Amino acid sequence: MKRFKKVLALVLAGVLALAMLTACDGTTTDPDKIMPEDGTPEVVMTVNNMAANKGLGQVKYSAKYSAVTKALLENWLEYTNNKINNTTYWENYRKITAELGSVKIVVGMTSDYRPGTSDHNPASKTSFKYDSLFKDESTFNLAEKIGVAYVPTSNGTVYQAVCLFDVN
């Protein structure tokens, strides 16, 4: 029994040493499992809590779709700051969303979205209204993934956008 314990201790020490040498700390490399510390975890939690309160499904964070949401938000900011016209806004929108393939934006800056309207998504971070995500609960239930984006402007205002994606 003593010999078994010694062998077990040596094996465990070897495993520990190997883990340290290979820098294996057990953390994930999946970008969707690591949310940026910019308020994104709180947004995802708020959206999922509101959905649960309404009896709706949950959405999972996606780094890929957050990048799409950010590109759409930047395009929206250019339009609202009169740097591009309506035609250019929609050309850019189509280019950004073409990368999605069969994935559809079902809530947020959809193809039905009108950039001049004020539905509080996108909006400045302080005036963002989560209720805007639940206007049509049937479309919310189509979503599996959430994209969250923030873009700071030169005047210090941070804008936020949330898009929900149907990936199936």
Predicted features along the sequence, with ranges:
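Bacterial Sec-dependent N-terminal signal peptides
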Residues: 1-11
